[in-house]
Amino acid sequence: MESLTLQPVSQINGEVNLPGSKSVSNRALLLAALAQGTTRLTNLLDSDDIRHMLNALKQLGVNYQLSTDKTVCEVEGLGSAFNASQALELYLGNAGTAMRPLAAALCLSQGEFVLTGEPRMKERPIGHLVDALRTAGADVTYLENENYPPLKITGTGLYGGEVEIDGSISSQFLTAFLMAAPLATADTVIRIKGDLVSKPYIDITLHIMAQFGVTVENRDYQEFFIPAGQTYQGAGDFLVEGDASSASYFLAAAAIKGGEVKVTGIGKKSIQGDVQFAHALEMMGAEIEWGDNYVIARRGELKAVDMDFNHIPDAAMTIAVAALFAEGTTSIRNVYNWRVKETDRLAAMATELRKVGAKVEEGNDYITIVPPTQLQHATIDTYDDHRMAMCFSLVALSDTPVTINDPKCTSKTFPDYFDKLAELSQPA
């Protein structure tokens, strides 16, 4: 297996223009495909998860032109649901942002579809979404294990009506249903069962649906009313915001070893909840400055925090590693859904933090971290999880090197992450 050893860094300084947001890119691509008219997406993310969505749309008969650097995509919308004259198998890798929304959208379509992916995708639950789709008239079959992909979908249309979705595991189930609902034959009311996790991701979904001309009535996140008979309208020029989760590594690096780092492409007007990460860093003692389209972080004496991170689970992983540089015991709470991401992130994070010398308690939905007086040089396993690789790169901001196994796994969202980090790093 390939590995990368990062030598100790004495200071971090500079500016990073963020790659496009994965969450925004895949939602906008799907809605652009269903819309009437053309949408030109700029600052699209070029990564594995987006490529899986683009390949699936091509198989489904969507025409698009992709620029040479793959960051501009002009999509000719179908103006309706997908139709396939022959059975199709769509391979979606480990892209939850493609699997869940496409599963819902294909129920509206005519045709027979199999949705599959890599082995980890077959361990990521989808039952709560399938239950809701079946309530609304969908024909969905599990091909291997109950409640998990691969799925076989026979497109019959969705008739809407009253539907209940369990929101306690992943907000992507609700996102998927919301995006399909305007094309159902009758009005849809979605009721949320359990506590809705990752609410800011629902805000992203609703915001993008509105940009494509569709209205949803959000009744305090407990119920959503979607009138039938709506059509998505091409959004013309659509700028994909920078990825706020990706920003977290650079902002944390500055908080630990700045100098200062300016990230551009997100700011105080961002639609992504993960910009709240900067507030968490500020609570730890970093100095943060906000602009409309940038965030600047500067070094501070970092102190431990004890916080509920349910609203920003992805960026919370970065806090877990920043905790190695903070005084006291850091507690990251209410992150059960780490367990159903690219890997079981609670178990993975606990294992790897212990390798560098931290004292860690791993609970069912929380993790507490006590930093060691001296970080140890360790070889970090990344579990085919892009965020594990990026998080643990921050260990090099000590006077200890760190070795990252399978560094190319960052290609899921940020293929040139290590190059960008090197540009900002001054070797010790």
From Swiss-Prot:
Pathway as given in its UniProt record: Metabolic intermediate biosynthesis; chorismate biosynthesis; chorismate from D-erythrose 4-phosphate and phosphoenolpyruvate: step 6/7
Active site: D314 (proton acceptor)
Entry GO MF terms: 3-phosphoshikimate 1-carboxyvinyltransferase activity
Gene3D superfamilies: Enolpyruvate transferase domain (3.65.10.10)
Chief location of this protein within or outside the cell: cytoplasm
Protein family per UniProt: Belongs to the EPSP synthase family.
NCBIfam families assigned: aroA
Protein name: 3-phosphoshikimate 1-carboxyvinyltransferase
Recorded name of the encoding gene: aroA
